[in-house]
A protein has these predicted regions:
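Acidic/polar residues at beta-strand termini and the immediately following turn/coil
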Residues: 67, 77, 152, 312, ...
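Cofactor-centric catalytic regions
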Residues: 194, 200, 353-386
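Polar low-complexity intrinsically disordered regions
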Residues: 1-4, 386
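Proteins synthesized as precursors that undergo proteolytic processing into mature forms
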Residues: 3-141, 156-157, 163, 172, ...
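Ordered hydrophobic segments in well-structured contexts
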Residues: 210, 320, 380-381
């Protein structure tokens, strides 16, 4: 299990991501006066610049949003679906939809991703490993090693268009015209929508636990949580995990992805998981600078994503958050969330090399208006990856 730092500044603002460059972008958004939604948009778009193996404009994902003013948790579903042998690019639509919760101008949330894409991006250790493990990459990518630099200027041009004209240019404008010439259905691009809905929830000793809706992998977690609440169903829960692992053995590559977390001083909390459906998606680099996603069906793509958001009874404060990509991370996730023997026994069945998630725990809730979770020393942040 590899650990990553959690960045907390300014006061009562927290961001989490596996790449320090992505974390820095999230922090920068808070320093500009943005909130958790603004930071999340910026981090998701930046991740596609620096870690295109696991995220990007070609992919999609799931978010959960806790707005204390509403007293409920919403799911933002922007999963990609099959489209002419490629996955429908969904990230831009998801990020633009999330901006409804933001405070900054849309352009301000994309400035850093554009700036980084205009530069030659340094290949991180994680990206170098992904390049080594990926088969069928374009030669100019396959030869890259840690510390090398790669041009993302084509992506920068695409991001600039999205920044200036909104996500509409990507799905029904200049960018979509180019995508339709490379195999995407112009009609499907035009009709694609990200959707908001109420998250699934279950009662807990501390309050409630929320799961994205409708995600197949989250339905599994929902059922596992319920089973673990009943000691008589402990073995049933364990067998469920083992059965899922056996069933998904051929889909392990699709477990690669990224997760992000952001919380602000006003109590808005956003947690997201994204993926290309495999390392570098289907390995096709579009002229617009991003890799197309793997062409999994919507039903299969739903099994790649999960996150849990545990709240107080009034649904105004988060006690714990965990997010990740891939069914193999569920055992560790449940173990971190619950800290009990049943969850730990399930955790013993994990495959560590496939786990990939982030976690935040605040025993007294986060954020407390007068004191942050970190100041209370009730925080656990974990990133596990390949």
């Amino acid at each position: 299990m590899a650990c990553s730092s959690l960045t907390q500044r300014p006061a009562d603002a927290v961001v989490g991501a596996s790449d320090p460059r992505v974390q820095d972008v999230g922090v920068g958004i808070f320093e500009k006066g943005g909130n958790a939604a603004d930071a999340m948009v910026a981090m998701m778009m930046t991740s596609g610049v620096v870690t295109p193996s696991r995220s990007g404009l070609g992919g999609g994902g799931i978010c959960q949003i806790l707005d204390p003013n509403e007293g409920r948790v919403k799911t933002l579903n922007f999963l990609y679906r099959r489209n002419n042998g490629m996955g429908m690019p969904a990230l831009a639509k998801g990020a633009f939809s999330l901006q409804k919760y933001g405070k900054l101008r849309w352009q301000d949330t994309l400035d850093d991703s554009i700036r980084l894409a205009r530069q030659d991006v340094v290949v991180s250790e994680q990206l170098a490993k992904d390049i080594l493990n990926a088969k069928g990459l374009p030669l100019e990518w396959k030869k890259l090693k840690k510390g090398d630099k790669v041009s993302r200027k084509d992506l920068a041009a695409t991001l600039l268009k999205i920044s200036e004209k909104g996500s509409g240019v990507f799905y029904n404008g200049e960018v979509s015209e180019g995508l339709s010439k490379q195999g995407f259905s112009a009609e499907d691009l035009k009709s694609y929508r990200a959707t908001f809905m109420d998250s699934m929830d279950v009662s807990t000793a501390a309050g409630r636990a929320y799961f994205p809706n409708p995600s197949a992998i989250s339905t599994l977690g929902y059922n596992l949580w319920n089973a673990l609440e009943n000691p008589e169903k402990e073995q049933e829960a364990l067998q469920t995990v083992l059965s899922l692992r056996e069933k998904n053995i051929a889909m392990e590559e699709a477990s690669y992805g990224e997760s992000f977390f952001a919380a602000d001083k006003d109590g808005l909390i956003v947690v997201c998981s994204v993926s290309n459906g495999g390392l570098f998606g289907n390995k096709k680099l579009m002229k617009e600078g991003f890799f197309a996603a793997n062409p999994f069906s919507r039903e299969k793509s739903e099994t790649f994503f999960f996150n849990i958001l545990q709240t107080n009874p009034d649904v105004t404060d988060a006690m714990a958050v965990v997010a990740g990509v891939g069914s193999h991370a569920w055992p560790d996730a449940l173990s971190l969330m619950r800290d009990d023997e049943e969850a730990l026994e399930i955790s013993d069945q994990r495959k560590e090399e496939l786990d990939n998630f982030i976690s935040l725990k605040c025993a007294k809730g986060y954020p407390n208006q007068s004191m942050s979770c970190r100041e209370n020393q009730n925080i656990v942040f974990v990133y596990t990856g390949k």
